[in-house]
């Protein structure tokens, strides 16, 4: 009887550790799913010639992809969605695309009544200041960094004052309809917990994006490869 009681007590002591490990595994699975979904979104968008202008892709320092943001989040506020940011490596963000860092889009109501069950967002970061502002802290779009609804069409002109001044250009896709959309009033920040789960406890968004020792997990390679194929080097 004492032996049975000891086994039972031991099981009770180990249960919290087993639960914590199970929760951590599940969270890591969620992060990998986010990366895979982001790769799928980018693949589908770049396969359609009339979506993002090629010259904008060629000039972008970073690309933020937020797959399947639920409409309900816009009604109740709080967390809009979670995704990833991929940046070009090297000095002045001119090298090949690097490892993806995890990011979250948050904020109160910003008038985004998209009218769909889920919406994908893509944000192009167009200059060094915009990219560097996102590496370390939360950024309010339209406040800390200028943002504009991006133009559509591979041959669309991106040289107007509005697009040239904007640090970020934002797009949405709902029910297959792709369009520029303003995200002013929301915030974009590094998802530190997710980055730790994917890359280790010392990993930060800034280190993942700027240090060559960080390599993309397998789940993020399709996203990085698709961007590299579409725009292998940044143009001035």
List each model region and its residues.
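Small-residue-enriched, tightly packed secondary-structure blocks
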Residues: 21-236
């Amino acid at each position: 009887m004492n032996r049975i009681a000891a086994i039972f007590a031991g099981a009770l002591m180990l249960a919290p550790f087993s639960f914590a490990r199970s929760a951590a595994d599940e969270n890591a699975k969620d992060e990998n799913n986010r990366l895979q979904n982001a790769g799928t979104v980018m693949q589908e968008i770049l396969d359609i010639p009339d979506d993002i202008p090629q010259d904008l892709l060629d000039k972008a320092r970073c690309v933020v992809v937020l797959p399947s943001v639920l409409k309900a989040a816009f009604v109740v506020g709080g967390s809009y969605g979670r995704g990833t940011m991929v940046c070009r490596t090297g000095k002045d963000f001119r090298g090949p695309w690097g490892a993806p860092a995890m990011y979250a889009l948050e904020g109160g109501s910003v008038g985004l009544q998209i009218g769909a069950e889920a919406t994908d967002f893509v944000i192009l970061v167009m200059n060094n200041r915009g990219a560097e502002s996102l590496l370390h802290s939360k950024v309010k779009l339209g406040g800390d960094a200028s943002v504009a609804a991006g133009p559509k069409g591979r041959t669309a002109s991106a040289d107007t004052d509005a697009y040239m001044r904007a640090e970020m250009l934002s797009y949405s896709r709902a029910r297959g309809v792709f369009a520029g959309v303003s995200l002013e009033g929301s915030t974009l920040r590094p998802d530190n917990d997710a980055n730790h789960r994917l890359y280790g406890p010392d990993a930060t968004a800034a280190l993942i994006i700027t240090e060559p020792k960080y390599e993309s997990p397998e789940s993020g390679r399709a996203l990085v490869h698709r961007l590299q194929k579409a725009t292998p080097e940044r143009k001035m």
